Amino acid sequence: MNKHNKSADALSLYLVTDSALCADKGLIETVLAAIDGGVTLVQLRDKHASDEALYTTACELKEAIAGRVPLVINDKVQIAHKAKLDGAHIGQGDLSVKQARNILGHDAWLGLSINTLAQLQQTHHHHLDLLDYVGLGPVFATATKQDHAEPIGLEGLSTLSKASVLPTVAIGGINHANARQVYQTGCHGIAVVSAICAADDPKQAAELLIAQR
């Protein structure tokens, strides 16, 4: 695990991978091009891969990124620990925050998905010292996560961002057309999937997104 400084700046342009969308260009090639374009953190997410396949991908991606930006994994905290990744992101229905932190250790990144003010308040009350950031959303409807909750919209995002004590990352349906509006709500960063993974030129896509900040 690399000792990345856990600054909110690392959340500025947060790439969540989608193996299917990256298939033509290659997952690793897409990620490296996106980092060249300004991506500041990468989350490996593949809901369909086996744990063995995901571990292999995690190790290959970690070697390719070579510490340039933090690499975290979605949900699979044990794989993050085993592959010595920089951390993990978990949802409301996954492993508890306390369990995840115990597995990952103090130095790792740990983020949690938040969809409502009640969830945020509960997080402040119970997990404030265990988390590094919260993911707020979905902001807009998105095709890359079929089971997502009701979109919170820009107004909901603004409310949650202002209420959060922790650094915030907005996620869900964010692209070049709305990135500036999302950044203007006060969140520390935006998380994107298809806006980069489905782009013909991931480097240029990342450059265009970070320019909206």
UniProtKB/Swiss-Prot annotation:
Q: Which GO terms describe its cellular component?
A: cytoplasm
User: In the Enzyme Commission scheme, what number(s) does this protein have?
Assistant: 2.5.1.3
Q: Which reaction does this enzyme catalyse, per its entry?
A: 2-[(2R,5Z)-2-carboxy-4-methylthiazol-5(2H)-ylidene]ethyl phosphate + 4-amino-2-methyl-5-(diphosphooxymethyl)pyrimidine + 2 H(+) = thiamine phosphate + CO2 + diphosphate; 2-(2-carboxy-4-methylthiazol-5-yl)ethyl phosphate + 4-amino-2-methyl-5-(diphosphooxymethyl)pyrimidine + 2 H(+) = thiamine phosphate + CO2 + diphosphate; 4-methyl-5-(2-phosphooxyethyl)-thiazole + 4-amino-2-methyl-5-(diphosphooxymethyl)pyrimidine + H(+) = thiamine phosphate + diphosphate
Enzyme class, broadest EC rank: transferase
User: Pathway involvement?
Assistant: Cofactor biosynthesis; thiamine diphosphate biosynthesis; thiamine phosphate from 4-amino-2-methyl-5-diphosphomethylpyrimidine and 4-methyl-5-(2-phosphoethyl)-thiazole: step 1/1
InterPro entries listed in its UniProt record: Aldolase_TIM (IPR013785), ThiamineP_synth_sf (IPR036206), ThiamineP_synth_TenI (IPR022998), TMP_synthase (IPR034291)
Q: Which cofactor does it need?
A: Mg(2+)
Residue positions annotated to bind 2-[(2R,5Z)-2-carboxy-4-methylthiazol-5(2H)-ylidene]ethyl phosphate are: T142, A143, T144, G173, V193, S194
Quote the NCBIfam families the UniProt record gives: thiE
Q: Which HAMAP family match?
A: TMP_synthase
* Record family assignment: Belongs to the thiamine-phosphate synthase family.
Q: Which PANTHER family does this chain map to? A: THIAMINE BIOSYNTHETIC BIFUNCTIONAL ENZYME, THIAMINE-PHOSPHATE PYROPHOSPHORYLASE
Please give the name of this protein.
Thiamine-phosphate synthase
From which organism does this entry originate?
Answer: Psychrobacter sp. (strain PRwf-1)
